[in-house]
């Protein structure tokens, strides 16, 4: 099975991003997100006409919750441990959103107390890979308890079959200071570790799984990530046409990307839809 990105949804999300931030008009809102977000939107779209409670975990400056809020009457909650999530309030004002149904919480997800089974929809978008050690399993179990019976849980995360890896960097990361020892940044799962640490740990029922990325040409890996010197100019020129390149190189399949030379940032991953 091979399917392509929903052009209409991608262009709509891109227009939303450009309205929110001038930077996105210049460099796009992220090539990897241009593959990932339309897929999530497509999975949630059948629910848009209902009045639901929605939680996005690890929101940060993501454009997705505000996009959802403009297309639905959902009660939206954005949650992140860092204050950068407060930009969501700026987005809400710019879009004229009803703030009685758009909430921004600055809390560590592992510590915050939320009512069990209180959300109809939960998204976990390229976040779970940043939980160090076995905390990803803890986070999955905790977040699953927040889902109402019959609710929808959509998660995406990097996956590189045959090359699972924990990445450490020599710089400050998400509040962790680099001194002498490299700091954990994120994880690339493989199918086995994803099944064990994400799906099984959640206790939820998997309904659908789709792998995504650049299959025919490693465009993002070779031409966007970690470019130096004059190559940065070429990268920026490519980023200015994020939508065009995502439509050309990105796709969805029933088999995962497997790339021995994959860099730390990747457009390759998995999207799983689960329920209770």
Describe the predicted segments one by one.
Residues 132-134:
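Short N-terminal helix/helix-N-cap motif within the alpha/beta-hydrolase-1
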Residues 123:
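A conserved beta-strand element that flanks and buttresses the S-adenosyl-L-methionine
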Residues 126-130:
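Short catalytic micro-motifs in class I SAM-dependent methyltransferases
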Residues 49, 148, 199:
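Short conserved AdoMet
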Residues 111-117:
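Short amphipathic alpha-helix with an adjacent loop that forms part of the alpha/beta core around
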